[in-house]
Amino acid sequence: MLSVENGLDPRAAIQVIKKKLVGSVKALQKQHVSLDTVVTSEDGDANTMCSALEAVFIHGLHAKHIRAEAGGKRKKHTHQKALPQPVFWPLLKAITHRHIVSDLEHLVFINTDVGRCRAWLRLALNDGLMECYLKLLLQEPARLCEYYQPTALLRDAEEAEFLLSFLQGLTSLSFELSYKSAILNEWTLTPLSLSGLCPLSELDPLTTSGAELQRKESLDSISHSSGSEDIEVQHSGHKIRRNRKLTASSLSLDTASSSQLSCSLNSDSCLLQENGPKSPDHSEEPMSYDSDLGMANTDDPDRSLQEVLSEFSKAQVNSAPSSGPNQEPDTPMFQTPLSLHSLATSTHLHFEGSEELFPAHKSSGTSSGGHKHQLLPQETPDEKQLGTAQAGPAQSTSDQQPSSPVGGAAGQGSGPWKALEYGRVGPKLVVSSPTSPKGKSWISEDDFCRPPQEPALKSAAGLCTSPVQDTPESRAALHGPFSQGPRKSCSLGALDKACVPSQACGNAQPAPAPAPAPAPAPAPAPGVTQDHKNFCVVHRRQMGLSNPFRGLMKLGTVARRGAMGIWKEFFCELSPLEFRLYLSDEERTCVESCSLLRCEAVGPAHSDGRFELVFSGKKLALRASSQDEAEDWLDRVREALQKVRPQQEDEWVNIQYPDQAEDAPEAPPDSLPPYSTLLPEPAGAQGMQLDWTSAQVPEPDAIKESLLYLYADRTWVPYIFSLSLESLKCFRVRNNEKMLSDSHGVETIRDILPDTSLGGPAFFKIITAKAVLKLQAKNTEEATHWRDLVRKVLASYLESAEEAVTLGGSLDEKCQEVLKFATRENGFLLQYLVAIPTEKGLDSQGCFCAGCSRQIGFSFVRPKLCAFSGLYYCDFCHQDDASVIPARIIHNWDLTKRPVCRQALKFLAQIRAQPLINLQLVNASLYEHVERMHLIGRSREQLKLLGDYLGLCRSGALKELCKRLSHRNYLLESPHRFSVADLQQIAEGVYEGFLKALIEFASQHVYHCDLCTQRGFICQICHHQDIIFPFEFDTTVRCAECRTVFHQSCQAVVRKGCPRCARRRKYQEQNVVS
């Protein structure tokens, strides 16, 4: 296999892919969910996520689907190894709508199947259909076997289930990734290395150990299509050709880098902005850097590299500059990124070896020889230099070994080009910006507005012994990780790891006296520790251990206090939206499920591990194994609450921003961007005049209908929303007429919440199964009215749904709990179990599939009607599976099999063995009008009476009868409760024979058992010695009052009342007289 010969073992590659995917998605959620911003191609974590998803589809491909050829620019360099080019476009076409396939195949700059695969992935993320596509793919095992090996990730049921559950976290993100760029026509090194087709050492040449390799993440790549950059590389003292002329493409290959996402220019139109129209063959390879400049010190294996780096960065940012004789003038700490125009200028790099600055160490054989990097053009006042500290003994050098090429670090997004300059104070980050137009600052929000802290200064000052340790370069050397574009990620890039301070900084500058022995890294200062209060979880995450809970935030065993004060252990799972309690880890029976959207309070952790979670209408008293474990649970719950709830602010202040003139001078490069550009938020009424007038006629079934503004495509669009007891409809007004734009069933509405973070109390959002609707009302009162009405409609629906679950009180509590667990996903289908659905038409669904929300209709996919629910589905969700409809059997005695959707078929399979239908309550007249049901009801009553006899017998016959029941013990409890399996057997004509066999077995036991015969009756009319039984319906009759059994013939001859009842009345009269 290619994955074994050329790269990692398939199982090891899966773990690498999962780690990349988990880290990038969590970083994107942390950055974008709270701010409701859109993820673009400029985000470094989006690059990593796309590379990991590409690796998912590449991992385990059969060799026949992998072309072993180099593409494009790589052919020009014979010394470069050919990159494999896996292709799975035919597989993707099989699960994709033909219109989307046509659009991708007609893209101007995408002319290869590889490009279509990569463009398809980004388009799926933009449309929010990645989870849906993966479900469809996993439901096609034959196609997967054709394309993938048995060890592939997509053919591993457990790993595929984890991937599917983890991708649900993408629903909280909005993507606008570029998918039309020509650079997508070839695979880059990152997804190929992650999937195991290429060695990871080629992706990261300075990394030697596999354990350290998993901890590293490649530096975010810059994608640029201009071909005017010429880069010269000079090496002294190495076996590399001097003055080698490199283009952006060759430099990318020389450093074994990869372009992880399509293009930072967001669309192919940007390719034409500066260089005019270009064909895909002439577009340049994106310039990106993935090689690390060193390795971090790993003396403490329990301490996360991320935590150490964060501590030193915060300590250095918070420290105040100290004056010294060697202190250089302060350089600006913030730099606006270069625009595309500035990137068009020529940039050159020179590398000159300086081996004297880097002594050899015996602890590692990895060569990281020093190079002196400087820009050929004259430095301008706009240049910014940041010194980076040299890594410690973990990245030793060797004088006899030639240094491997060191890739320059390039900022992500629209950030400037950066080159490393190794001076006498260590490597410096030099940014040349001849023209500095406005742009987003690459400094993150955590890097400014912090008061100076003296303890942190002292802690950071103790790390280096150099006399010039307080220069701006040395202060910047400890400032890491570098913020990259709009990214605010906790994951470490290659440049971040190179800038980790080592145990001593004696090599930073030559000193007259020999440097002292390296001292262990000091503990974090109190100021730094105080900054770590922003950590969401204080135990496993701060120790640097990965999340072991497979997509969940936390799971474990917790005791819960019951109504009688008795503690009982449950297995608990905390997901981003729910807190669930199971009976045990092995028995996956959910006994409680609480939505975090309705969490009202989180109690403190006590010394014995007790803590409380308060939800609307209930309070959970829980107890963990220790106080630390309880605090860990509470921290995870608070973290989840921060993600699902809007940030509340106590006070609102309206700030009026003056309009800026068009010819206003640009801000200096060293100035901070305004606060409004740091936190992008939807432009509300302050930026545009909203028209609230509407003269449309309300819908006939509307409870509430008014004009609201919906936030879509970064602007507020007016819509007319109509709320009824069944749905929430969205209309667009065109030519003074209402046109249905979308429709959300009440069963799909999860909650409605105020969202003051959008601009004020008049903003709110409705959370549905398909999307999150961000709305703006005319005023606060109107928004409050909408929220109250939607909550009342939801409460009404939930009450009716609960009544449908209990089916009129015919289910006991245990059966209800089992039913709720079995129908957690498809609970809204319960209402159609005993009621014939009404076909409402395709317009009521807004021309969307009721299963996957795809557009259906005559101009799209042909809609298919589900006979069970009366809803319309697409051809993927409805594959013409046939089944009997229980409601039609109950009410119409219609035994015909009708086509149902896959969702309904799965629902019927889940509840197949549950006795949910009480025929006596739903339609008792069916016994009278249908002869077969009359006989079945009679047999069910006989079996019930026989079950009472066998239940009192000590011979063990009841166990034997239960084996013959096939887990239908409810047949012995109630004669009127039926399951879907019973109705299906009735329709097939095998149910009567099944009951007769059970009656024959039970009656034979009663007749021949000494204990059971003694519980028989003697006819009190004829007083015959024959023993009679109540289940002998053909020869006996039973008194309805005292339940005494008589011969049917004797009762007909006497024609009097029950003699036993007559005696009882006589005794009662005598007692009254006496």
UniProtKB/Swiss-Prot annotation:
Modified residues (Phosphoserine): 218, 433, 436, 491
Residue span(s) of domain RUN: 40-182
A GO MF term: zinc ion binding
Bias type Polar residues, positions: 313-329, 393-404
Pfam family, one: RH_dom
Motif LIR, residue range(s) on this chain: 649-655
GO biological process terms on file: autophagosome-lysosome fusion; late endosome to lysosome transport; lysosome localization; positive regulation of bone resorption; positive regulation of ruffle assembly; protein transport
Statement: the UniProt record of this protein carries the keyword Repressor: no
UniProt-annotated stretches for the region Disordered: 214-244, 272-336, 382-454, 506-526, 661-680
Chain intervals annotated as zinc finger (Phorbol-ester/DAG-type): 1004-1058
Sequence segments annotated as region (Interaction with RAB7A): 672-1074
Gene Ontology CC terms, in alphabetical order: autolysosome; autolysosome membrane; late endosome membrane; lysosome; nucleolus; nucleoplasm
Null allele phenotype: Osteoclast-specific conditional knockout mice show normal tooth eruption, developed normally and are fertile, but trabecular bone mass in long bones and vertebrae is increased. Osteoclast differentiation and number are normal, but bone resorption is decreased. Show mislocalization of osteoclast lysosomes at the perinuclear area, instead at the cell periphery, and decreased ruffled border formation.
Highest taxon of source: Eukaryota
Span of domain PH: 551-642, 701-795
Listed InterPro entries: DEF8, PE/DAG-bd, PH-like_dom_sf, PH_domain, PLEKHM1_PH, RH_dom, Run_dom, Run_dom_sf
Description of its domains: The LIR (LC3-interacting region) motif mediates the interaction with ATG8 family proteins GABARAP, GABARAPL, GABARAPL2, and LC3A/B/C.
PANTHER family: PLECKSTRIN HOMOLOGY DOMAIN CONTAINING PROTEIN, PLECKSTRIN HOMOLOGY DOMAIN-CONTAINING FAMILY M MEMBER 1
Assembly: Interacts (via N- and C-terminus) with RAB7A (GTP-bound form). Simultaneously interacts with RAB7A and ARL8B; bringing about clustering and fusion of late endosomes and lysosomes. Interacts (via RUN domain) with ARL8B (GTP-bound form); the interaction is required for PLEKHM1 localization to lysosomes and for ARL8B function in delivery and degradation of endocytic and autophagic cargo in lysosomes. PLEKHM1 and PLEKHM2 compete for interaction with ARL8B. Interacts with ARL8A; the interaction is weaker than with ARL8B.
Protein name: Pleckstrin homology domain-containing family M member 1
Source species: Mus musculus
